[in-house]
Amino acid sequence: MGSHAWGGAVFSAATLIAFGSVVHASGTVAETAPQSGHAVPADQLDGETLYKARCAACHDNAEGRTPSREVLSKNPASFILASMRTGAMVPMAEGLTLEEMTAIARAVGKADAKTDDGIDLRRIWGNSVEGTPLDAPQCSSAPTPVDLGAANQWNGWSTEKDNGRFQRKPALDVADIPKLKLKWAFQYPGSKNGQATVIGDRLFTTSTSGAVYALNAKTGCVYWRHAAEGATRTSPVIAALPEGAPAKTALFFSDFTKAAVALDAETGKQLWKTVVDDQPALQMTGSITYWDGKIYVPISSGTEAFAQIPTWECCKFRGALVALDAATGKILWKRYTTEQEPRPFKLNKAGRQMWGPSGGAIWVTPTVDEARRLIYVGTSNSYTDVPYDNSDSVMAIDADTGAVRWTVQLLADDNYIDGCWQKGKEHANCPNPLGPDFSIGAAPIYRKMADGKEFLLVGQKSGMIYALDPANKGAKIWERQLSLGSALGGIEFGTAADDGKVYAGVSDIASQAKDRGKPGLWALDIRTGEVAWNFLNAPDTKCRWNNWWCHGAFSQAISVIPGAIFAGSYDGHFRAFDTATGKIIWDVDTGTKAVTTLSGAKAFGGVMDGAGPTIAGGMVYVHSGYAGRSSESGGRDLRGTDGNILMAFSVDGK
């Protein structure tokens, strides 16, 4: 699912980034080849020769969203080194010593600021935040204890385990929405972040720099900051621990060290860390779900990008869901999205062994059906010609045992690798035929109506939205085509539902249509699938950033309260719509004018994508400036004022 890694300049949309798509945190080095006892110092190595041997094949002939060398050169050498050590390029850097990686980084990147001799890993922008100044003032007084009974909360990806993203108690009247004004803005380190979680007076959030923050929800001051050992973009979830545990409440997240992590929610101290899988190209994108003493961790992959490299051994990854004991971090069960283990099936055009089946990544946050004790997930496309039985599927998994109770495949044979759609290029690992990359990127929504009728609502990058029957093994109740879809949606991150309607944001940024599709927001009757209203946004909108990402796409997750729905779009506009009519109630441009952040710096918002609005305690929190797409480099220079900011709105800014 190429959509869940951030993009670069004016690149076509069907691709994951092959370099630096995630920025990892910590000076802790991920596993690489053993270091020689007689390593040659980096300053004695020819970084240019090493680059040509290991990197040029992709970056000198950049395709899709793979950044060109010119784009890479705008980044500090430390960022490039971090990508090879602990980031998305770890598989590509296999066998290189630290000195060789450093030589490549110096040859390609620009000199780092604020370093004395060589590269100071303690000051990597986008790498470890440890030892750097806080991004907002420290709170002057201690917080009250974390109260999971607080009325004002939004805990994790959604307010409830059904993933409806429906805040029933927002402490915000629809009549007051036009009076919302910016109260404070917090500039994240890193290029992306997890959605904010609010519990009482605490706000918890994560970033791809590895920074996990606890802020005051009303003022934005910092209670604590934890430096994780890897990039994280998942939404924190908070839960009580059993008596005798080392903390009363825990904060759970996953990171790109292939691990689930628990922190003491009061202090940020790490309680445990468990590596949940060790497959090649593994990523952690979907947020964790906590329920009944367990956490459920979805596993996704960057295989589509890495497989562009002819010498990369494609493809061994299988998506999975892992259940852990929340108190101890012990793995209770792991369910791959197919029972078939990848096996050798042919040599690619470069003579490398190919494996299959492979694919079925889980990009979404797991959904809980409490009555049936089932976990629902959506899966991604497959990567090879070998059929993958549960690709582009909805799966119902037993919450206690991990057994698969039923599956519904929405699209078969969606076999996809980045760059393969470009004609005239040699691609060693391309499946035949090539699929459209129509993964399920939005978490399934479980909704039980007042009369007991049940629905499982599923949006897909194909532009389709489905209502399945959870009481009848996922049988289709209705389906509706909202757009032609694309590798970046169609429906990407964003669906939400109240008690009568389901709402879907349509991206269409990568649409093959000449007019770049019909981005917008749709409202449908949950029972029938009939369209109640839709809002179409101009694809050729104007933005401060003059690049391919200036588009009217509604890709970011959306959120609903009684009477209003909040949605951000690629053009930087954050809007509230009347749920009955679709009329715009409120519209703020987050990307045109710089705002003063809590650190005192000026920063811009911009492209709105990924994790969506959090609404709690009469305030609305949303991030703007996703992945640097609204900067001059279109997503590669992570420093400066072009995002990535968390904006907190309140009535009259009070």
UniProtKB/Swiss-Prot annotation:
Thermal dependence of activity, per record: Optimum temperature is 37 degrees Celsius.
Domain called Cytochrome c: residue spans: 42-159
Reactions mediated catalytically: a polyvinyl alcohol + 2n Fe(III)-[cytochrome c] = an oxidized polyvinyl alcohol + 2n Fe(II)-[cytochrome c] + 2n H(+)
EC number: 1.1.2.6
Residues engaged in binding heme c: C55, C58, H59
Cofactor(s) essential for the protein: pyrroloquinoline quinone
Tagged with keyword Oxidoreductase: yes
GO-annotated molecular function: electron transfer activity; heme binding; metal ion binding; polyvinyl alcohol dehydrogenase (cytochrome) activity
Record Gene3D superfamilies: Quinoprotein alcohol dehydrogenase-like superfamily, YVTN repeat-like/Quinoprotein amine dehydrogenase
Signal peptide, first to last residue: 1-32
Field pH dependence: Optimum pH is 7.2-7.4.
Enzyme class: oxidoreductase
Superkingdom of origin organism: Bacteria
A Gene Ontology cellular-component term: periplasmic space
A Pfam family matched in the record: PQQ_2
SMART domains linked to this entry: PQQ
Keywords: Heme, Iron, Metal-binding, Oxidoreductase, Periplasm, Signal
InterPro entries linked to this entry: Cyt_c-like_dom, Cyt_c-like_dom_sf, PQQ_b-propeller_rpt, PQQ_rpt_dom, Quinoprotein_ADH-like_sf, WD40/YVTN_repeat-like_dom_sf
Compartments where found: Periplasm
Assembly information from the UniProt record: Monomer.
Role played: Catalyzes the oxidation of polyvinyl alcohol (PVA) in the polyvinyl alcohol degradation pathway.
Family: Belongs to the bacterial PQQ dehydrogenase family.
Name of the protein: Polyvinylalcohol dehydrogenase
Organism (species): Sphingopyxis sp. (strain 113P3)
High-level lineage: Bacteria, Pseudomonadati, Pseudomonadota, Alphaproteobacteria, Sphingomonadales
